[in-house]
Amino acid sequence: MERQVLRLRQAFRSGRSRPLRFRLQQLEALRRMVQEREKEILAAIAADLSKSELNAYSHEVITILGEIDFMLGNLPELASARPAKKNLLTMMDEAYVQPEPLGVVLIIGAWNYPFVLTMQPLVGAIAAGNAAIVKPSELSENTAKILAELLPQYLDQDLYAIVNGGIPETTELLKQRFDHILYTGNTAVGKIVMEAAAKHLTPVTLELGGKSPCYIDRDCDLDVACRRIAWGKYMNCGQTCIAPDYILCEASLQNQIVQKIKETVKDFYGENIKASPDYERIINLRHFKRLQSLLKGQKIAFGGEMDEATRYLAPTILTDVDPNSKVMQEEIFGPILPIVSVKNVDEAINFINDREKPLALYVFSRNNKLIKRVIDETSSGGVTGNDVIMHFTVNSLPFGGVGASGMGAYHGKYSFDTFSHQRPCLLKGLKGESVNKLRYPPNSESKVSWAKFFLLKQFNKGRLGMLLFVCLVAVAAVIVKDQL
């Protein structure tokens, strides 16, 4: 591992990854890989999660193609220097912010969307000019295998590497020094990643999870709400970090919600859900048994059927759920949807705020003021009103958590920013010492007074303002020179 990181660092220090042209070439190569080897990629995803190729494409591949296209179209602007506002003391100088690559970064992907959650951060790392090591999840072994086969064929092997393996390999990787680590996964492992990174003072982006609440107001179109909630909850068999984890609603709505979600599930997957090509399976037996244990002692209003041999767990709804029960103490990450009764929106807000900050928050209501009130009085990684999941698809929005649900963000320009250092640059001339004397010892009341004038008056170059302030500073310089 150490030699591999050193090899990438030497390649990065050569400057090869910095030119804009090189970055664009690598992004185009990555797009070509996705397009040319689409069938193999889809087959690998399907094998890992019992996912149809159509779902694999719409859930994962299309997102990567969109992210690459965004970077190809916007990278020249993202990578360019941005002029910075100046004060009077620096008005004749050049001040700007120059994005620069961090160096060698580590990307640790997740198994639930093994392609998009590994490749989307890589797109950002390449766009920002970094070298990168990619570590796919070992649980999605087929996707990890195809990535290990394809990436070296399309990307510069000296700058981009892939490491496969389990806990020992990840542990060894985390011992190495990186310039940034982006990890997607659960909170417990996120703490391990952060602890390892702290030994090298390596910054981290942690995309974790949590129990994402979904509040349904009584003033709501229940048909629309239940259709959208069922889609977001049961896609990928509930194994989505921003799936609605549980529903909060008034007790009078509970039976209606159960009935409407039951009808929606039938529309989505047919009478025989198990035979539907659109309904996936739990990733492995360990997660299956964990989900099985969450159902013990619960009132199952719908679903609950399971087949351990095929890791099938039907779309399930729980009613009259005790907030202190096990199913409400951990992220479910499966097709189990508890409904918790609250008296009103005030109680819902308190319920949410009494728990860890979630990765996502959903509110359904015809009343936009109520939706905005919930947003204002709670905290979460992201929010979608009157829908679920969809904020993930908007690459002009940052995607990330807060508190226990993570730190940092990516997607679109935010991916570029995450893997970049925003370097402040000030280029001064060698003239103007009469004004610069203000900062040289010995100090005096007069110097402090002039410093207040020069430093507290902000200046941004304008057409007329430029001429006026040049004259002002010239006069001030003469006065300062006479007084010092």
From Swiss-Prot:
Membrane topology, Cytoplasmic segments: 1-463
Compartment annotation: Membrane; Microsome membrane; Endoplasmic reticulum membrane
Catalytic activity entry: an aldehyde + NAD(+) + H2O = a carboxylate + NADH + 2 H(+); a fatty aldehyde + NAD(+) + H2O = a fatty acid + NADH + 2 H(+); hexadecanoate + NADH + 2 H(+) = hexadecanal + NAD(+) + H2O; octanal + NAD(+) + H2O = octanoate + NADH + 2 H(+)
Membrane-crossing residue ranges in chain numbering: 464-484
One term of GO molecular function: aldehyde dehydrogenase (NAD+) activity
Motif interval(s): Prevents secretion from ER: 481-484
GO biological process, one term: fatty acid metabolic process
Keywords on record: Endoplasmic reticulum, Fatty acid metabolism, Lipid metabolism, Membrane, Microsome, NAD, Oxidoreductase, Phosphoprotein, Transmembrane, Transmembrane helix
Entry annotated with the keyword Lyase: no
UniProt modified residues of type Phosphoserine: S293
Cellular component annotations (GO), alphabetically ordered: endoplasmic reticulum; endoplasmic reticulum membrane; membrane; mitochondrial inner membrane; mitochondrion
Family: Belongs to the aldehyde dehydrogenase family.
The protein, known as: Aldehyde dehydrogenase family 3 member A2
Organism of this sequence: Mus musculus (Mouse)
Lineage, uppermost ranks: Eukaryota, Metazoa, Chordata, Craniata, Vertebrata
Originating gene: Aldh3a2
